[in-house]
Regions:
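Extended assembly-interface regions of large multimeric machines
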Residues: 1-141, 149
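Sequence/fold signature of self-assembling virion shell proteins
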Residues: 125, 202, 206, 215-258, ...
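Short alpha-helical segments and helix-capping/turn motifs at coil-helix boundaries
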Residues: 80-90, 180-184, 216-220, 317-321, ...
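Alpha-helical scaffold segments that mediate packing/assembly in large oligomeric complexes
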Residues: 236-238, 251-317
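Extended, solvent-exposed, turn-rich assembly/linker loops in the middle of proteins
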Residues: 286-357
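Surface-exposed beta-strand/loop patches in extracellular or lumenal glycoproteins
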Residues: 146-160
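Beta-sheet entry/capping signal
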Residues: 64-68, 97-102, 231-233, 328-334, ...
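Acidic/polar, low-complexity extended loops/arms that serve as protein-protein interfaces
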Residues: 75-80, 95-136, 162-270
Length: 443
């Protein structure tokens, strides 16, 4: 089906590729963007054909074919121009509802501090690699001693001595088990509050029943996606449209339609940025935000160039935070407030876009290969970093369009007024806030 759609709309896709290359400094459309555009062209084509046919009610336009072509051209240009394509994964929908399915791998058994259901590996990142996890498949059991100095043996086969790590010296020592559930060291002091690893000669793989061997397994989860409509109406006077055509040589109805579609595109990009911004705020701890708060006030004896270039340290710290959370990802884009641009101009590795094409949020340049965008929804000094990979599992969010730009019939009233509606249908969802982190530049 996908290949058929790409072939069916190959001519329109070539036009879209040429438009993107011309207006976005030679940028090429990704295969996912091309497929998304083809699916939306097909959805829009079928919608217009069905909704404006003779059974439902004939359109008032003289040339239905020309108007349909115009609407498809709007889709062809609007979809590839969205910066949402660069900030989140775009998943076209062939129905107004769908879901994202993914797997995560969890522990199926208890072994020391590793409990049944603990996540080992997920599409969103790896689980915590602590001392207990390191020894999950070994003969060693790692378990936390309670405040009372007692612990419950994880397996009935485990008996005998205990190897524990001294919290002060960080050395491993040997303790002796007592019948009352306590362990004492060589000085007969109760071992408490330390991470311990205890083993026994009886704890061998070939001595354990198969059901007791440490095991992991998959768990499938779903994220629902339901497309919701966004609508806008355009109204104008019939005589005004006539004067525009005869006196100035342009079609007012198409001009207004393009403006309406531009407004829809502006809102889509802004809504996606707002979703990511809120996700970054929710996913960033106080300590992380404090580490990513940078003052542009010049220290005594330091030039503006040297100090502003130090903002790179904050960017690298943000990258490290996302990597430490997931153990597998780095951010590849940054969204900033407009007043951060003067700082970026001083940062080594920043390359500005020469011919900026903007409709609300826009791409301003690159910083060491990381795309940088400006959005009017960002408050003064705000910025956040995020990741948009090649699939939903490596992206912070998803934009799932169902209908790109679909029109209603053009209606006329007795007083000469003309009215028409335009709508877009799409779903969106925040997938992984661990792929987002926010910071701030203060005075």
């Amino acid at each position: 089906m996908r290949q058929n759609l790409l072939e069916t709309y190959s001519r329109q896709l070539k036009v879209a590729e040429a438009y993107v290359a011309k207006n976005f400094e030679g940028k090429t459309m990704s295969s996912n963007t091309a497929l998304t555009t083809a699916v939306l062209l097909d959805n829009t084509n079928r919608w217009i054909t069905e909704s404006l046919n003779s059974e439902i009610g004939a359109t008032t336009r003289d040339s239905m074919g020309a108007w349909k072509k115009f609407c498809l051209n709007l889709t062809n240009i609007a979809v590839p121009s969205l910066i949402a394509n660069d900030l989140v994964i775009v998943h076209p929908m062939t129905s107004y509802s769908g879901s994202v399915a993914y797997l995560e791998y969890v522990s199926l058994t208890n072994k020391g501090d590793v409990k049944k259901g603990d996540v080992f590996n997920s599409v969103w990142g790896h689980g915590e690699m602590n001392e207990a996890r390191q020894n999950f498949t070994s003969q060693v059991i790692v378990e936390t001693v309670g405040d009372d100095g007692k612990l419950t043996l994880a397996d009935s086969l485990v008996t005998g001595g205990l190897s524990y790590r001294d919290e002060e010296t960080r050395e491993y020592k040997t303790a002796t088990y007592k019948v009352n559930g306590e362990y004492t060291d060589d000085a007969s002091k109760v071992v408490a509050g330390a991470k311990v690893a205890y083993m026994t000669e009886q704890f061998q793989m070939n001595h354990i029943p198969s059901k007791e061997i440490p095991a992991i397994g998959p768990r499938m989860k779903h994220i629902p996606l339901v497309a919701e409509p966004r609508r806008i109406a355009v109204r104008y006077d019939q005589i005004t449209a006539f004067q525009a055509k005869t006196d100035y040589g342009f079609s007012l109805d198409k001009q207004i339609a393009e403006q309406a579609c531009g407004e829809l595109a502006y809102e889509i990009d802004t809504e996606i940025v707002a979703m990511l911004k809120d996700g970054a705020k929710a996913g960033t701890s106080e300590d992380e935000f404090k580490a990513l708060t940078w003052s542009k006030t010049l220290p005594v004896g330091v030039s503006k160039f040297e100090h502003y270039n130090g903002f790179l340290e904050v960017v690298e710290t943000a990258k490290a935070i996302i990597y430490n959370r997931t153990k597998k990802f780095h951010p590849n884009y940054m969204v900033v407030a407009s007043d951060i641009l003067p700082v970026l101009r001083f940062v080594n590795g920043f390359t500005a876009v020469k011919n900026v094409k903007m409709n609300g949020p826009y791409k301003v340049g690159e910083l060491d290969g990381m795309n940088v965008y400006v959005s009017p929804i960002m408050e003064s000094g705000e910025f956040f970093l995020g990741l948009n990979g090649n699939d939903m599992m490596s992206s912070a969010g998803v934009y799932a369009p169902y209908m790109a730009i679909v029109p209603t019939q053009l209606l006329g009233t007795p007083d000469g007024g003309m009215a028409q509606g335009f709508s877009t249908w799409y779903a969106k969802a925040l997938l992984n806030k661990n792929l987002l982190v926010r910071g701030s530049i203060v005075a």
